[in-house]
């Protein structure tokens, strides 16, 4: 059964009703874009189209909406995995790229590597025509938030769990009509990160995983926690053991909560039969899902 699930990040989502509705519409539209791409191609096309739509929206902490590092610059991470081939591609700490997930796909399909970082990833983006003007990554709203978190840091009030008040990684998982699975995740990281910091989003087994016959997963939350818990691979193993996608994602997030505390992670997953689930230990998680002719989203 053709199925696509997206997330727009786990966290507080304490936003205005106007933004809440805009985010919900963006999630629904991302699912529609992904489903349309899947009908033309397959699962990989679907997750790329869905994530790219969210990157371009500017509403999430990915693509044009990416947050600022400590030096005031924007560095993005993204990763993708093809469940049919077992191949993955990712980019880390890349600047000025219009779609980090498209660049990650290029790494997967056009190179022998899994991850490209920093200047090397940016150079590949230039060669592929995937760069964008730097001004597109800055806005008055983000400038205001940057000033706010800088002041909190000066007062000693800033800590990693606070990133989920502001940050909302995006991701997608899909099962296509041929039974192929794919997963993708994209993010701008966390406010005030040190330049060069890499989170979970470009790391297979942490921020994403896809494997035909088993399932596909995309994570969101505090990157360091997701890396240390190998969240997506943990969910994959639980799914293989239990055969229950809901139990797999819930138990994986429960492990994170026991080990690292609440307000740290969220996860979406789909299995080889098109059954899907999501779990999170935060106040909320933006998510959308659908199949041809049926699309829904919630915050």
Swiss-Prot record:
GO terms for cellular component: cytoplasm. It catalyses: L-asparagine + H2O = L-aspartate + NH4(+). Pfam families: Asparaginase_2. One of its GO terms (biological process) is proteolysis. The record marks 168-169 as: Cleavage. It comes from the Archaea. Substrate binds at residues 197-200, 220-223. GO terms for molecular function: asparaginase activity; peptidase activity. Optimum pH is 6.5. The keyword Endoplasmic reticulum does not apply. Divalent metal ions and EDTA do not have significant effect on enzyme activity, indicating that activity is metal-independent. Keywords: Autocatalytic cleavage, Hydrolase, Protease. Displays activity at a broad temperature range and is highly thermostable. Optimum temperature is at or above 100 degrees Celsius. Shows a half-life of more than 150 minutes at 100 degrees Celsius. Its EC number is 3.5.1.1. Catalyzes the hydrolysis of L-asparagine into L-aspartate and ammonia. Also displays D-asparaginase activity, which is about 20% of the L-asparaginase activity. Does not exhibit glutaminase activity. Heterotetramer of two alpha and two beta chains arranged as a dimer of alpha/beta heterodimers. The uncleaved protein forms homodimers. Belongs to the Ntn-hydrolase family. This is Plant-type L-asparaginase. It comes from Pyrobaculum calidifontis (strain DSM 21063 / JCM 11548 / VA1). The lineage of its organism: Archaea, Thermoproteota, Thermoprotei, Thermoproteales, Thermoproteaceae.
């Amino acid at each position: 059964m053709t199925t696509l699930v997206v997330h727009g990040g786990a966290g507080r989502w304490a936003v205005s009703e106007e933004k809440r509705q805009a985010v919900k519409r963006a999630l629904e539209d991302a699912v529609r874009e992904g489903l349309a791409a899947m009908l033309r191609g397959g699962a990989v096309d679907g997750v790329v189209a869905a994530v790219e739509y969210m990157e371009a929206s500017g509403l999430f902490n990915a693509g044009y909406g990416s947050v600022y590092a400590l030096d005031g610059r924007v560095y993005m991470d993204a990763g993708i995995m093809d469940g049919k081939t077992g191949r993955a591609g990712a980019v880390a700490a890349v600047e000025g790229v219009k779609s980090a997930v498209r660049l990650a796909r290029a790494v997967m399909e056009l190179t022998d590597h899994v991850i490209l970082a920093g200047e090397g990833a940016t150079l590949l983006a230039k060669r592929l025509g995937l760069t964008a003007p730097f001004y597109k990554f800055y806005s008055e709203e983000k400038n205001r938030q940057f000033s706010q978190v800088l002041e909190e840091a000066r007062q000693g009030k800033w800590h990693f769990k606070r990133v989920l008040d502001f940050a909302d990684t995006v991701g997608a998982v899909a099962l296509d009509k041929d039974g192929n699975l794919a997963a993708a995740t994209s993010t701008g990281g966390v406010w005030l990160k040190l330049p060069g910091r890499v989170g979970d989003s470009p790391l297979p087994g942490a921020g994403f995983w896809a494997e035909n016959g088993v399932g596909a997963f995309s994570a969101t939350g505090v990157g360091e926690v997701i890396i240390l818990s190998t969240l997506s691979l943990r969910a994959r193993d639980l799914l293989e053991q239990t055969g229950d996608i809901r139990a797999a994602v819930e138990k994986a997030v429960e492990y994170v909560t026991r080990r690292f505390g609440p307000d740290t992670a969220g996860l979406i997953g789909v299995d080889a039969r098109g059954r899907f689930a999501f779990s999170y230990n935060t106040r909320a998680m933006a998510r959308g899902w659908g199949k041809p002719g049926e699309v829904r989203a919630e915050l």
